[in-house]
Amino acid sequence: MEAPNRTIVEQMNALPGTDYPATIGGQIETPRGVLFMGDMTDSSQETDWREFERVYGLTGRDGLLKYPIYEAIGNHDIIGDSPIRAHVKRRHGALAYSWDWSDVHLICLDMYPDSGTRAWLAKDLAKIGRTRPLVIFFHYAIEGPYSDFWPQADKEALAQALEGYNVLAIFHGHFHHAGHYAWNGHDVFLPGSPRHASHQFLVVRLSASQLAVGFWDFDTRAWRDAFAKSIQR
C-alpha cells in the first residue's frame, strides 16, 4: 500500500494554490492539518506504525506530508496486543481528545463514542458552550454499509449528546467509500481510502459563512464532487 499512500501525500502537499471546484470557488490555502479517520495500520503491528510515520509523518516535519496529522483509532489498529493505542495516547493524551483551530473546536471521539467517551464528551462540550462551531470525527460508520460495528443505542445517545450544539460536520472512516449523508440533522462525510475503488480524500474549507467540502480523486487528479452549505460562526 505504500505506492498509493505516497500518491496521496504528494497530492496533498501540492494542494495550496489549487482551484476549488467551480461550485465552491476560490483557491486552496495551506491546510492546517489532516484528520485521519483510523486504520493507520493494517494489522496493528509496530512495523505498520513505523511505515505510517515514514510515509505520512505525524507533525508535518517528520515524514513526507507537510501538514500535521490528527488521528482516530480504527479497528485495524487494535488487533491483539496492539501498540498503536499507546502511540496515539502518547501523542494526544488520550484516544478521545480535542483542540481549537481559531474559533472552531475539533473533537476526536476514539474509534466510536461509547459510554466512557460520551462522558468525556459531555465534559468537553460543557467547557465551550452551545454556539461554538464543532467538527467531530471518529472511525466507525453511523449509517450505511458496515455501520453495525457499534450499537444503535450508542448512536442514539450520541445524537442526544450533540442536540443543541453547533455541529458543522461529522467525519468517519471504516467504509472504504467517499460520500456524504445526513444523520440527525448533521452533515456526515466519508473520505474514501487507498484500498479498494474509492480513491478520494476530502479538502475542507471553513469560512465565516460557509462549510465547503471538495472530493479529490487521486487517481484522476481531479475533483469528483463538491458540497457547500451556509453556516454560523
Which residues are covered by each model-predicted region?
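Extended active-site neighborhood of metal-dependent phosphoesterases/phosphodiesterases
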Residues: 10, 45-133, 154-166, 177-214, ...
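Short, flexible/disordered intra-domain loops and linkers
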Residues: 1, 145-154
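N-terminal active-site segment of His-dependent metallophosphoesterases
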Residues: 1-48, 233
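Active-site glycine-centered loops adjacent to acidic/histidine catalytic or metal-binding residues
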Residues: 38-39, 74-75, 139, 173-174
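Short acidic, glycine-rich surface-loop motifs adjacent to enzyme active sites
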Residues: 24, 128-146
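Histidine-centered catalytic micro-motifs
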Residues: 136-142, 168-178
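Short, solvent-exposed aromatic-acidic interface loops
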Residues: 27-30, 215-224
